[in-house]
Amino acid sequence: MRLGDLLAPFALLFALVAALAATPAHSALPAAYAPIVVQPTGLPDKAEFDLSAAQQRAQREGKRLYVYLGASDCPFCRRYEAFLDANAQELLPHFTPYLVVDLRSSLRIHGEMLYIRVGQRSLPYLAFQQSIGDARTRQVVYPSVWLFDSKIKPLMQMPAGTGTFQTVPEQLEILRLEQ
């Protein structure tokens, strides 16, 4: 058997992996919300999510940021995403002041690995939480949501994790910034 014959299956596998890596990122959030998908860079050592482009766009458009940290293998994230989809008709008008940002993660990404970048500044998750005055400065919780102004200043303290704002009235309170 020739070397080329032995390597052919590996070449096919490599081509398939390369094709999958080249496909555009898809949001887990419903398309109706027009989410900006941010994939992590720096894997496998760290997962850095760069909010710079979303922040710049928010500044240009005079919008706030609704930043969603979800994990592809998180059942509670799937539940929240399904809730948003099922209630889109009622919720979408209240999302108008926001750009929705979907940070695509996985449950294997923990706090020591997760970094948030804004401009030239990249901070580990806990340091980022502390820098914005977020009381949730512990381990990464999926799903998590932050509401920011266009300067990445938090607009309110947010709940996180299971059962988080899964009713329309709760979601509307958050979008309206009612504490």
Regions found by a protein language model. Give the residues of each.
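Hydrophobic beta-strand anchors of alpha/beta hydrolase catalytic cores
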Residues: 66-67, 145
